[in-house]
Amino acid sequence: MKFNQFAHVKVPFEQKLAELNRIAFLHAGDEDLASNHIYRLFLERAFPNFKTEAAKNHALSNLAATENADILTYLNSSKINARVFYAVGLQLLGFEAELDFDLKDPFSAMDKLNLPYQKEIHHRDDVINAWYDLLCTSTKKGQNLLDILANRGYFTQFYQLNLTEPIFFNGKAQPVFDTNKLIHEVVYVESELDTDQDGKRDLLKVIITRPAMTDNGMKVPTIFTASPYYLGTNDASAEKMMHSVDLPITRKEVKPLSYQDIEYHKPETKLPKKRPVVISTKNAEESWEHLFTYTFNDYMLARGFAVVYSGGVGTLDSDGYRTCGDEAETLGAKDVVEWLNGKRTAFTTKEANKAIPAWWSNGKVAMTGKSYLGTLATAAATTGVAGLETIISEAAISSWYDYYREGGLVIAPGGFPGEDADILAEECFSRQKSAGDYNHSKDGFNKFLSTITKDQDRTTGNYNTFWDARNYLKDVGNIKCDIVMVHGLNDWNVKLKNVFNLYNKLGDVEVTKKLILHQGQHIYINNFQSLDFTDMMNLWLSHKLYGVENNAKELLPDILVQNNTKESTWETYSSWQSKNFTKLYLNSDSLSAQKKENQTLEFSDHLPETTFKHYQTDIANWKEEILASTSPKLETNRLILTSKPLKHETLLKGVAKIKLKIASQLDHGLVSVKLVDYGDAKRLGATPTILERRGLDLGYHWKEDNLVEFKLAKETPFKMITQAHLNLQNRHNDFSTDELEANKFYDVEITTQPMFYHLPKGHKLGLVIYATDMEMTLQGNEENSYRIDTTGSYCLLPIEE
């Protein structure tokens, strides 16, 4: 257990006094009190749920100052000092005496836990200084102490003050607005789209939650999440549409194309006229009931931020069709931002006879969300839309080709074999859930869906005009907002190439960019114990949306990475891709810095039918056995080459390049590679451990979240680091098809998904080479075999030692 805080702002003593006064921890005259007296007042105020003097005395009597005295007894006879302050402080932070720390020596535990402390406390000002910092310190639940006090009702004293602006403490907005009095309403933004071609601009349903004080004139910024999922999905119908993956890859017609041959150009279309605005009102006519929300958004609702959700075109109660990642979905998100910024019209109902402005908005917007949600945030940012001040995009797609394809191959997102753009469009076309609406829209949508099925081209797997229209990287130069990117280093759903390419493209754009890489798969991280992610984003949004001068841009690391070998360890870096490449040659069964005699290595792609069927139904078993050093069922179906045991820990940082001289027995084929960490070790679990179910309160009598953390699991012999796949007819790029003659050797270069991986001392680095990937590629079980000539076959590894 260790805590990593990056959002703790160091401020001068005078500012600490002012801020403690602002949140009522200091009252008039307190600054003249003796150190013991002011310390006791601080303690009493730290128990807002104990209302009377007797109740507070009881609470304080349960805090041990020493092995023999509680804090009340101690203060009656002794002066507060640093040891006692932090012995009590650790208890306030939720740590247990004897289990987590020693009352006689709290400092050793604080060093181990990576918690800040003040070495000396003698005078009143020392107490004030230390108390301010303690309020900002991580508790055992990962939240700071002030958040824990807020959850107990500390800030309810501000509810009746009719505040017209937030209160900030240590650069972060505090929960001074009553979540029991939030205003919930619905509007319909008129978009710049007519995706269903009914002669009317598509109206987009927007769900709003805002503080009650906005009705009294308070202007607030908005946290906007564009979520095609939030009003439900068509799981059953999408499942029926899933494409079969029981197909071999086929030879492709040789086509030497240039990028210009497949480049997307926006067609000239004439939009229907805007609806006339006859009446304008401030009063919404609809509210909303239940929807799936993002817990970070929930957390910010008490802190002076509005939260908005919109599904976009084709979702329940909106107009139009789902288009899976193209410009229509981008513009749908952009248009909501424009309404929040005062530059677009919305209506109170689908009848569209009363316009309603975002009169409560200060015009500033941040977008949040993971996966498709983060993708739409990225997409909206590439429009350069005014009012979008920042995005916090998590596990976001930057090019849809890199989600559903790779290297001229149809590739399934991890866990979803057979899914494609058309399936996702159907999945998210939640207009289908409204029978009356669906009756009018289903024929047109099904016809539109058939064009997606055709244009996505599952036959060749090549990059084409369809995918070029869904490549946000082309428009990164338009981005004007600052960006926080978050991604899992073990995410095989939205693969790391997406954030890696976006991060690199942003290098030429004059915006602030921050990158956080965690050890998770496709997850949120705002409920981690070891990282103050929520505080970091609160600091960031307080700066970006309220203009608070809190050094957020300087405090948050440019690149923050969770270590893969240790629990609760986060490290800062200045770059992702290593500039240094180490060359290791392929030999008969090894990787080495020395080139040995030339050999030809061979593997087959075909499996016995019973084995093939077994792996189709147990992909997890295949994923284990393809990497295992001894695996009788796959012995001839892959090559495993390993380095010597490492003499010291090595960091793999960025993409690796695998150069192979390879021949296919047939006139078509594919090659797949994995880099593997071989060595017995306890490794972080694949998913975070739930430390306490619903253990995180997100406010006072408000919503909850699970408290989680990655923990070292049982010992395993290996772990996949990264992988890549390539169609041998796409040796030069993803859009141009090359010739491939049977049994002829060709030089290919395979670029892996990017890495940030510590390879421990004594472990071996392994390269696994095979063809069909039972988790990701098509699975035809074809009678094909491959040969690799070790002449000219080697790895270029991005190693930093």
Curated annotation (Swiss-Prot):
GO biological process: proteolysis
UniProt function note: Removes N-terminal dipeptides sequentially from polypeptides having unsubstituted N-termini provided that the penultimate residue is proline.
First-level EC class: hydrolase
The EC number(s) this enzyme carries: 3.4.14.11
Protein name: Xaa-Pro dipeptidyl-peptidase
UniProt-annotated location(s): Cytoplasm
A GO MF term: serine-type peptidase activity
Naturally occurring in which organism (per UniProt): Ligilactobacillus salivarius (strain UCC118) (Lactobacillus salivarius)
Subunit description: Homodimer.
Pfam families reported for this sequence: Peptidase_S15, PepX_C, PepX_N
Keywords on record: Aminopeptidase, Cytoplasm, Hydrolase, Protease, Serine protease
Gene giving rise to this polypeptide: pepX
Active site: 371 (charge relay system), 491 (charge relay system), 522 (charge relay system)
GO cellular component terms, A-Z: cytoplasm
NCBIfam families: PRK05371.1-2
Family: Belongs to the peptidase S15 family.
Reactions this protein catalyses: Hydrolyzes Xaa-Pro-|- bonds to release unblocked, N-terminal dipeptides from substrates including Ala-Pro-|-p-nitroanilide and (sequentially) Tyr-Pro-|-Phe-Pro-|-Gly-Pro-|-Ile
Cytoplasm as UniProt keyword: yes
Major localization listed first in the record, in broad terms: cytoplasm
